[in-house]
Amino acid sequence: MKVAVLGAAGGIGQALALLLKTQLPAGSKLSLYDIAPVTPGVAVDLSHIPTAVEVKGFCGEDPTPALEGADVVLISAGVARKPGMDRSDLFNINAGIVRNLIEKVAATCPKALVGIITNPVNTTVAIAAEVLKKAGVYDKNRLFGVTTLDVIRAETFVAEAKGVDVASVKVNVIGGHSGVTILPLLSQIEGVNFSDEEVAALTKRIQNAGTEVVEAKAGGGSATLSMGQAAFRFGMSLIRGLQGEANVVECAYVDGGSEHAVFFAQPVLLGKNGVEKVLPYGEVSAFEANARDAMLDTLKGDIQLGVDFVK
């Protein structure tokens, strides 16, 4: 199994690479790429950790050597949010970065499962899809927007609010990966009940959690460690699916034939072909149905921005 991390010298990439080095199945290969010249050094640093995972680092303009033979590609390259920015402010820089990297993926490892972490995910996934289509290698079952950070935040905040064991909390988060497009389905969580006020407050906190971190870091960055862990969880689920493990389910932002938008985050069953099945997200409350319907214009606009960027 070979996993490539593109953007490996950044805060998310380094956290993700550390977790992968310590947790990937024995015999795996971990390939790190970033434009920054420090990247081979990050690989050397990680190589001193005693696990049976081979690490190599690559830097410069061309990620091709890092991508050769990759089964899974996780892309976190791009600029981070600063205070006062929202995820859409990142579009002008990150759109071009994702386009260029996906062109190389299309040429080098078109069958790889690709997880896009680079924000704004609502738009960058659409960019990736259009680039892959142009190259004639698009497979909607192999492209994912990684929304797992919304899921782990929801799990954490619910457990804190209700004083329950976080391991017992399972939350589906649907829609997209910014602001109002993030919709945790709190009504479905077993064993806990919320007042209307609690639902409204928790939903807003989950939607704005990224800003909470950006402001707390006071200009020093955005969510890197929690995003690294979320990307690791999702990446490992992709690998478990590839290895034939049954019943591997994660929420992800996919081109899954949703009635709501071309790309929509919802639970997916993962397997040897990436998405084996898009799963229904179940019954929702009136609050959730209203929030879902209210987000769709924003989500569709984000997607169209990506389509137009490539055209």
From Swiss-Prot:
GO terms for biological process: malate metabolic process; tricarboxylic acid cycle. Its EC number is 1.1.1.37. The active site is at 177 (proton acceptor). Keywords: NAD, Oxidoreductase, Tricarboxylic acid cycle. GO terms for molecular function: L-malate dehydrogenase (NAD+) activity. GO terms for cellular component: cytoplasm. It catalyses: (S)-malate + NAD(+) = oxaloacetate + NADH + H(+). It comes from the Bacteria. NAD(+) binds at residues 7-13, 34, 94, 117-119, 227. Gene3D superfamilies: Lactate dehydrogenase/glycoside hydrolase, family 4, C-terminal, NAD(P)-binding Rossmann-like Domain. Substrate binds at residues 81, 87, 119, 153. Catalyzes the reversible oxidation of malate to oxaloacetate. Belongs to the LDH/MDH superfamily. MDH type 1 family. Homodimer. This is Malate dehydrogenase. The gene is mdh.
